[in-house]
Amino acid sequence: MKKILQISNYQYPHIGGIEQVARDIADSLLDDKEIEQKMICFNEDAQDGDYLCHRKETVHDSVDGVEVIRCGCFAKVASQSLSFTYPHELKKVLQDFAPDIVILHYPNPFVSSFLLPMLPKNTKFILYWHLDITKQKVLGKLFHGQTLHLLERADKVIATSPNYVDGSPYLSQYRAKCEVIPNCIRMERLTPTATIYKKAELIRKENEGKILCFGVGRHVPYKGFTYLVKASKLLDDRFRIHIGGKGELTQALKEEAKDDNKIQFLGRVSDEDMIAYYLACDIFCFPSITKNEAFGIALAEGMYFAKPAVTFTIPGSGVNYVNLAGVTGIECSNGDVQAYADALTKLANDPELREKYGKAAKRRVEEHFMYDGLKRAIWDLIAEM
């Protein structure tokens, strides 16, 4: 019997990229009766139906049959949650549960500051590297030494793309420890129902004769939606651009686009509506501009629906590993609004190219970024340890 402890930032019902990967890993191990697992994370205000979490509470519950220890938080600084109870809860689970393998989802500077002294020498340590600390430059410098200690202690470092290994100033120094396990999408979450097909048909009918472009994500600087809005101004009236999501830049984006009738802001998009727009669109727009976009799950999802993608070049990011320039879509120079508009126009003018890239996009996702692939890779990884 192997015991595995995952250290995630948060967990369902709070859903972000890291949390989804942690949940996928936990799900992938449920079928192995020789594995016992637990998860520890920060608590956060979040709700999904009757499932309700409160940030300040420390609670033990379960998700998908896996025990989750949620540590109450008293503050959040530079996106990092802070908790008085976390050190005690972590020490307790390390002693009582005595995991054979600990998986730390990085970055998590707060937990990293006290994890290593608590970690028994014979415990295998997997550092699951989601992204470099790039936005908070002061924090990055402050925790430089800590990060090196984590990498030194790690028995294995998991990256989500070879691009990130090559482009990270940290991972590139520890290539021998690195293994690439791409993030994944799950087919069952993206299977259209009859209702969804009807919604997609309605979207097409409402925009008959138009080239539909769809982009979705949080409205924050690194997502690059301001560049998509600017590119729209350079397009002709054949185009309709639907932008899903919300965030700190939503109002600024709407102000920027107020005289552009080609753009429609959808707000927060339900899972059903998201699939409907994936189905209905002609082109998937993914305008992220920095390495904070380490991979691009929404990009992979759009490609899964056989849509050509238009992305920017982001050195060291997995975005350009997911969308292959000239194979599954078009890649534009970073932040080049004119090039982005030209790429959309090129695809609009060439239905055969759209179909060619779209088919290749779907094939690439099916071959490299599906849940079954992640599950096999995680099983192999655990077997090695």
PLM feature spans:
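Nucleotide-activated donor-binding/catalytic signature segment of Leloir-type glycosyltransferases, i.e.
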Residues: 251-272
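Short alpha-helical donor nucleotide-sugar binding micro-motif in glycosyltransferases
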Residues: 151, 268-269, 276-281, 303
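Short hydrophobic beta-strand element within catalytic cores of glycosyltransferases
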Residues: 305-313
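Conserved donor-binding/catalytic core segment of Leloir-type glycosyltransferases
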Residues: 5, 202-223, 229-233, 242
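A short, active-site helix/loop in glycosyltransferases that binds the activated sugar's phosphate group
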Residues: 152-192
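N-terminal subdomain of nucleotide-sugar transferases
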Residues: 1-55, 60, 64, 152
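Acidic donor-binding loop of glycosyltransferase active sites
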Residues: 279-294, 307
